């Protein structure tokens, strides 16, 4: 849980200690301002607080940093400050209809309508156009026949009328009255001609219908396959260059994309599917369905998919459950699992009906859990201190021990005469970016995802599933087996107040981590490991660092809600102390932490001490018999000789020691670094642990063998390193052993995989770690920070232990202070 100021000796050995203090706590440009990487633009970061001790957070106007993208993106129009120019442009647009965008769109739409109404996409005439052309040609062929027919008809009428007239006028015998046609005969003749005319007109009217029938019987496509002609490289002159489809067109009601039918497209504005089996060539029947053979094909495809899924899904479920069962037997690795399969095989054979309907879907419902391994799944809504016991077994065994050097759990641990040898579970239930960078590295720097608060807020509704998967995968039962096998005997478990409750608009995932904490304690019991409870984040944040949950202002005992959060933190301890005062935890939870690293360099010291006294009395009143720890607050340990003299009994002072956050210590070479531990730290810890010359029983709750600050996100997300001179913006000072003499220090070696470490470097790392074990062993003992990391090899006890630069057994180191410092071979000092 390191931060950029975690060592109590942070200011000792500085070239200018006062400058360094001002840099961090007064008006540090590193914290106040960031710079644009390309433009070197200076701006205040979001959520920046001018003074960590201030009660209010000023807001800044983002308009000062308004960014105009036109210079970089030609698609973004430049802003014009020429008002007259813009007025002239608008007037020209109004005078010329072609210059008007909307008019251009309408013209383009009309032109495209005429074009699409005549020609298809391939440049060939549409069906409607061909029909019109056929009818035109047929009409042209029929026109001469009609004219001849009408001429013959007219001549017959004239001959008939002339003959009748001659017969009436003639006096010849042949034309006498006895031979004249009667009126009836003339009427019959006239009727005959009329019937002939009617038949001809009927034939003319029938001709278009017959022609349409002949067209329906024509083949739609020929024997040879046809392809659409490609679009021309250049638009023909006079033809509009309209888009195929345009968002503006659609918004203004222009035609949709044409739905093509085989043989050519329908007219523009037409988007109807034709039923291919019985289309009669008309535009009616807009409700026609797709052809039967197409519907049948899709039904076949859907049926095949259903059958495949019916086979695949059960097989996948069975394999997933088998995988989870195998993990239970062998103990899965605690490395991050990239699969999304939950560990729920223990639900097999159980009925969801065993969970009361009122509790189904709640935090007490195992069917909502991502991981059910080693939980008691028998439902109970019983609580202690308002906290659920769901998942716990009703019996337990405290006869176990991790090794023969340690008494079993049901016997007292000899604190003071035998040192604690423990590890932390950092980054697990209280997330820290440098331990689990995979949760943070996929976001842009603009998102400002820098801690668990901003991460959960960004994840939104998926926060619970994402965070619980991390809980289930990051630490498993196998880790506790490995801790035992490494010779360790204590585990300091980090958790935060949102394991119990959340307040106001907290985005944290509430209450899920509680059951993982309880299961971890049961794993510790199983392998004889004693537990140190460590509340890492309390309401309001006790230090404003990312590992408290939220980076920024300290809101605990400080600011507008300082007293409110003081009470909330006491309420938190009231609940968890009642819970862990149960008899089942008496032998396994032997150290009880109050709050991790309150920043007493910024908080009123008396307020912190008064709260510490109140909290200790509260938890002891509730039945806690474990040792209660108070952190040194980063004050010089010598000051604690006079502090909390009238404290309650059974308390430990907790100090955290690192060399890499102090610029006077990070520059030490390998040998001098070991000397610092065995000379200065050894005597300092030994003295503070005594009641006569120091404070009393003291533990070192955090330390590591890291000799650089190179790990990703170690100094906060987006922050550089002291080792390479990138830690402070505007200050490129390099803090490493060869900074003045060369060669240049690089993080490449420190961040390399452990398999690439040289034998000399591994020897140094192990000696460096064992020297600290020796120094802290002069007091109550130590807890290494931390057990497991995703990639920071120098911060993972497990990685060091498995790769040969940590003692095989923590209780049997190869080096102790007082021994000759071994040679590290040709190990370069910049390594």
From Swiss-Prot:
User: Into which EC class is this enzyme placed?
Assistant: hydrolase
Q: Which residues lie on this side of the membrane: Extracellular?
A: 319-831
List, alphabetically, the GO terms of the cellular component aspect: cell surface; extracellular region; plasma membrane
Which InterPro entries does this chain map to?
Answer: Glyco_hydro_5 (IPR001547), Glycoside_hydrolase_SF (IPR017853), Glycosyl_hydrolase_5 (IPR050386)
As recorded in UniProt, its EC number(s) are: 3.2.1.58
- Region of interest called Disordered, as start-end residue ranges on this chain: 1-179, 192-241
Keywords, A to Z, come to: Carbohydrate metabolism, Cell membrane, Cell wall biogenesis/degradation, Glycoprotein, Glycosidase, Hydrolase, Membrane, Polysaccharide degradation, Signal-anchor, Transmembrane, Transmembrane helix
Q: Which residues lie on this side of the membrane: Cytoplasmic?
A: 1-297
**What subcellular compartments does it reside in?**
Cell membrane
- Biological process terms in GO annotation: cell wall organization; glucan catabolic process
The membrane topology noted for this protein in its Swiss-Prot or TrEMBL record is:
Single-pass type II membrane protein
Composition bias (Basic and acidic residues) maps to 1-24, 44-56, 79-93, 102-115, 137-151, 198-213
Active site annotation, chain numbering: 597, 702
Query: Which transformation does this protein catalyse, written as a reaction?
Result: Successive hydrolysis of beta-D-glucose units from the non-reducing ends of (1->3)-beta-D-glucans, releasing alpha-glucose
Sites carrying a glycan are 376, 381, 393, 410, 442, 546, 558, 610, 636, 669, 689
Q: Which domain of life is it from?
A: Eukaryota
User: What one GO molecular function would you report for this record?
Assistant: glucan exo-1,3-beta-glucosidase activity
Subcellular location, principal = membrane
Q: What does this protein do?
A: Glucosidase involved in the degradation of cellulosic biomass. Active on lichenan.
Q: Which family does it belong to?
A: Belongs to the glycosyl hydrolase 5 (cellulase A) family.
| The protein's name in its UniProt record | Probable glucan 1,3-beta-glucosidase D
Q: What is the lineage of its organism?
A: Eukaryota, Fungi, Dikarya, Ascomycota, Pezizomycotina
